[in-house]
Amino acid sequence: MSCSNVTMLVSSKPSLPDASNLSFRSAFNPFQLPSQNSSSSCTPSRPTSIQCGLKDLKNRIDSVKNTQKITEAMKLVAAAKVRRAQEAVVNGRPFSETLVEVLYSINEQLQTDDIESPLTKLRPVKKVALVVCTGDRGLCGGFNNAILKKAEARIAELKELGLEYTVVSVGRKGNSYFNRRPYIPVDRFLEGGSLPTAKEAQTIADDVFSLFVSEEVDKVELLYTKFVSLVKSNPIIHTLLPLSPKGEICDINGNCVDAAEDELFRLTTKEGKLTVERDVIRSKTVDFSPILQFEQDPVQILDALLPLYLNSQILRPLQESLASELAARMSAMSSAFDNASELKTDLTRVYNRATQAKITGEILEIVAGDIECIIW
């Protein structure tokens, strides 16, 4: 005797098996298991209907087991890589931040002496270059989606300001995203490596340097995912060029074109009510000792440090993005592993109940046949 189809209800947290969960009616015998409505049994919150044969059910269990092994392996690999990526981020931040402070101080001295450098010259903004850093692989939750949404939001802001824009895409996911949207102008597509290197950062730096110096663009912004912790990361917009410690980069009409993320929101009171004001963030500068003197001219020092500045300011976001991607992948694979374990438990329970119902039905048919023989 075979049971072709078995229909069971499985919730996210199924209750203990009882007689009310089994219902079987043979096609040849009107006998049916009695149904008992127990008030103590938990009502499934969102039941999911599983309707398939025992063989298909067994295949689904095997498939879930294979998926569980894959997600566990990917979680372990991401956990092993994220530690090294996190160390690279933590070790690289002090150098990058100190270099920016020194450059800002030298730049202020140059502005005092009315000396201009190509990368520090402020000019009315007509066109903005957006360097968007994404990942090369998927299966990392909403990591790539978050930074691409940030890029779309920034593009919408630039359109409202009446400014032109171009995109420098870094990462395969970003390349695929912008390739499917031909209406977004892209200057260059770049693929990231497994580990960010100074050579890869130099390639991006050379591209944005040529765009800015040739005045094809008047401002370069870097969009990346800042690594905060293993469970948190934030999409960030960072102004890369021109090098301005005060911000306030304006267009030809004098309107500020800085992104909202470049400003600090302060909660204050106005007329007895809470209100939000925006205060421009001013980067910290290093106060050099009066005894400290430069052997070379400050312009020469700035020209020598600016390539190092560009390289470090691009390498650090690449490292931050990689650490955020690995942390997101580890979290996503951990959730997928837990979901696969729960689904395997539910499917196994359904399979066991279906097998039990099949055996019980066959026993009932045998008993019914014996009773029919006795009656005759």
From Swiss-Prot:
Gene3D superfamilies: 3.40.1380.10, ATP synthase, gamma subunit, helix hairpin domain (1.10.287.80). It is a peripheral membrane protein. Its main location: plastid. InterPro entries: ATP_synth_F1_ATPase_gsu, ATP_synth_F1_gsu. Produces ATP from ADP in the presence of a proton gradient across the membrane. The gamma chain is believed to be important in regulating ATPase activity and the flow of protons through the CF(0) complex. Keywords: ATP synthesis, CF(1), Chloroplast, Disulfide bond, Hydrogen ion transport, Ion transport, Membrane, Plastid, Thylakoid, Transit peptide, Transport. The active site is at residue 133. The lineage of its organism: Eukaryota, Viridiplantae, Streptophyta, Embryophyta, Tracheophyta. SUPFAM superfamilies: ATP synthase (F1-ATPase), gamma subunit. One of its GO terms (cellular component) is chloroplast thylakoid membrane. It comes from the Eukaryota. Disulfide bonds join 250-256. Coiled coil: none annotated. Residues 1-52 form a transit peptide. F-type ATPases have 2 components, CF(1) - the catalytic core - and CF(0) - the membrane proton channel. CF(1) has five subunits: alpha(3), beta(3), gamma(1), delta(1), epsilon(1). CF(0) has four main subunits: a, b, b' and c. One of its GO terms (molecular function) is proton-transporting ATP synthase activity, rotational mechanism. This is ATP synthase gamma chain, chloroplastic. It is found in: Plastid, Chloroplast thylakoid membrane. Pfam families: ATP-synt. Belongs to the ATPase gamma chain family.
